[in-house]
């Protein structure tokens, strides 16, 4: 099927989503796992009310967290709870697998107004 080439499966890079309301998902390792495995851990968090819910005067909020390690702040975990988390996670999972850093995210131009923009605005 794959031309006779074996490829190891990186189980830390498999995104997982719960299609609840609101949806939640994660890829990579948790903050606790990062602290056990690495000396330098940086965690960026964002809590916000998505534009859709703000305009509708709904109390629903979203919580996003990015776990980074090392002086370069390589992203090793992304955890999302909120509007569109299920859709947002896939692209960021690919970026994380390719070695993205928090600085790479900060250098991106955000699409506004979206929940995904919170991930590139976090520090």
Task: List the predicted regions and their residue ranges.
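Flexible, glycine-rich terminal cap/loop adjacent to redox cofactors
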Residues: 2-7, 14, 19-123
């Amino acid at each position: 099927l794959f031309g006779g080439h074996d490829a190891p499966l990186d189980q830390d890079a498999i995104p997982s989503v719960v299609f609840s309301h609101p949806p939640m998902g994660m890829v990579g390792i948790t903050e606790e796992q990062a602290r056990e495995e690495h000396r330098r851990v940086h965690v960026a968090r964002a809590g916000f009310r998505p534009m859709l819910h703000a305009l509708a005067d709904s109390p629903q909020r979203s919580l996003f967290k990015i776990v980074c390690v090392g002086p370069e702040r390589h992203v090793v975990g992304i955890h999302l709870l909120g509007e569109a988390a299920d859709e947002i996670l896939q692209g960021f999972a690919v970026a994380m697998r390719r070695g993205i850093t928090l600085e790479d995210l900060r250098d991106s131009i955000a699409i506004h107004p979206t929940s995904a923009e919170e991930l590139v605005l976090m520090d």
